[in-house]
Amino acid sequence: MAQRFKGRSLFLTALLCLASQGYAVGLGDMLERASQLSDKLHSLSTSLTNDLDTHFPPMGKILMPRPSMCHTASLQTPHDKDQALRVPESELLSIARALLLSWNDPLLLLASEAPTLSHPQNGAIYSKTRELQDQSNSLSSGLDRLIHKIGSSSKALSPLPLQGGDLGSDKNSRLINFYFLLSCFRRDSHKIDNFLKLLRCRAAKQDRC
């Protein structure tokens, strides 16, 4: 599955690159391809969460921090579709980009911690975390090109850093914090996917988005 995701990601990224090389790639096409990348990113994070669930202790979810503790929780984002529809296109794109870039270092941390997790599928988990990085980088490049085409927002947001550089000193803490960090990413990747699909719909000037 990783090879399939990687092949499609490279193909979609190559298509997004056409716009920066002088080829006539319309905004709708660029948003379509960015939406496909974001959909794959969220699907991959869901698959990774399911892998962790197979051997995750029930007590772990009780001890896990609340979603409000995610490092991106303070980033102001639309709460629902109606609110997102009132946000200008350039600003909504800036929000999606800030969310995505906030995960550069956390995804690197997840990939570095995955091989030593106390989990029987840590090899597969490691492969998927690396694939998350590749997908995220591909989408980031696509969003940069979209911002260049649409124009930057006057309310451009900055990425939020992750505080702390490790997941804990004992195996249980590391597994719980790994799961928590992944759950935060899954939530944010869902937001990014929704925002990009909404932008795609608005670019197509559909009556109902």
Swiss-Prot record:
Disulfide bonds: 70-184, 201-209
Keywords in alphabetical order: Disulfide bond, Hormone, Secreted, Signal
UniProt main location, coarse: secreted
InterPro entries tied to this protein: 4_helix_cytokine-like_core, Somatotropin/Prolactin, Somatotropin_CS
Coiled-coil boundaries: none
Pfam family, one: Hormone_1
Similarity field: Belongs to the somatotropin/prolactin family.
Organism: Anguilla anguilla (European freshwater eel)
A single GO BP: positive regulation of cell population proliferation
Compartments, as annotated in UniProt: Secreted
An example molecular function term from Gene Ontology annotations: hormone activity
CDD domains linked: prolactin_like
Signal peptide: 1-24
GO terms for cellular component: extracellular space
Protein's name according to its UniProt entry: Prolactin
Gene3D superfamilies (alphabetical): 1.20.1250.10
